[in-house]
């Protein structure tokens, strides 16, 4: 109100030569709103409205008080509420456009697994409230585990729950560039940058590990971070590394990162990777169908990388569109993803994903197979795992023995048993062949 009263004083001075204009039309104005860089003022008298709206000097008076103002509109009561509703809608649109978020990342299409469940729950809690109970929230984990998806989903859910929230998603390299640009601006560019961030309700920072060796950027971030915390604002940071593993970031900044809730996202299991691939395919084209075997194979060669899964889904979409075939099976999958299969066989793979796949095929618990339980059905599945790891993936007997807590000779005997069995059992041979990707 103080700012608007100052504006009225400027109007009074501007119209001092127009006898009675201020006292009759301006003095008693008390309904106004400044939103989305527009100053909307309720004024019932049509003559006064027209006079003020036609005066090009009015906007210049307002510019001295309202930073970034684009227009001053004097309207009647009916138009006031109509324009107010429109301004609020435009304001929400502008808030989202300036947020840096993508509508593609939501909680609805985020696949929850044991590895990300706690981080997901913390994100949901933060998006549903305006308190800073878990802030700063620091989420870390290896590349390709869906951290960026979760981070942006938090922002999108915040907008869904609080349409007028001020949210900003920024990658650390982009923030560093903002700092550089601010240094070259006149009129206290750095102070404006700080103010812009400190006025936010929720700040989402991606790739925090890249901040290393950017001393000036870290200094600015430190100041912003402190003020956000002091003002009980919400902060979420995402990194490939835990705070203590970050390189070239000083201790006081590390301490700030660790001052809230610290959560790690673990690798996905095979079933979660399969579900993620299903979601990705459905998003691209709900008509594409994929067999369970093909889905498992595609998930296994993804390297536990959600981005790689998205690339696989894109290739499957391209195949479906160009070949007019909507069903993906193991045969055409190996044709479509020939390069991916080649790379998978050449590089080191995760033996536990294979073991999980075998256990699913034989319908036995993976933890039982990895235990020392000697039940016949578990021994058989354990032997099959040993055989595949040795014969198809060329793992050393000692490495296999370490996984199953068995001796070199025990693994060797298991491999020989399975080799002999598949000579006489065609159904087992077919099953083992299908398990090799």
From Swiss-Prot:
ATP binds at residues 144, 146-148. Residues 1-72 are annotated as: Domain I, interacts with DnaA modulators. CDD domains: AAA, Bac_DnaA_C. Residues 321-437 are annotated as: Domain IV, binds dsDNA. InterPro entries: AAA+_ATPase, Chromosome_initiator_DnaA, Chromosome_initiator_DnaA-like, Chromosome_initiator_DnaA_CS, DnaA_C, DnaA_dom, KH_dom-like_a/b, P-loop_NTPase. Residues 72-99 are annotated as: Domain II. Keywords: ATP-binding, Cytoplasm, DNA replication, DNA-binding, Lipid-binding, Nucleotide-binding. One of its GO terms (molecular function) is ATP binding. Residues 100-320 are annotated as: Domain III, AAA+ region. GO terms for biological process: DNA replication; DNA replication initiation; regulation of DNA replication. GO terms for cellular component: cytoplasm; plasma membrane. It is found in: Cytoplasm. Pfam families: Bac_DnaA, Bac_DnaA_C. Belongs to the DnaA family. Oligomerizes as a right-handed, spiral filament on DNA at oriC. Plays an essential role in the initiation and regulation of chromosomal replication. ATP-DnaA binds to the origin of replication (oriC) to initiate formation of the DNA replication initiation complex once per cell cycle. Binds the DnaA box (a 9 base pair repeat at the origin) and separates the double-stranded (ds)DNA. Forms a right-handed helical filament on oriC DNA; dsDNA binds to the exterior of the filament while single-stranded (ss)DNA is stabiized in the filament's interior. Domain I is involved in oligomerization and binding regulators, domain II is flexibile and of varying length in different bacteria, domain III forms the AAA+ region, while domain IV binds dsDNA. This is Chromosomal replication initiator protein DnaA.
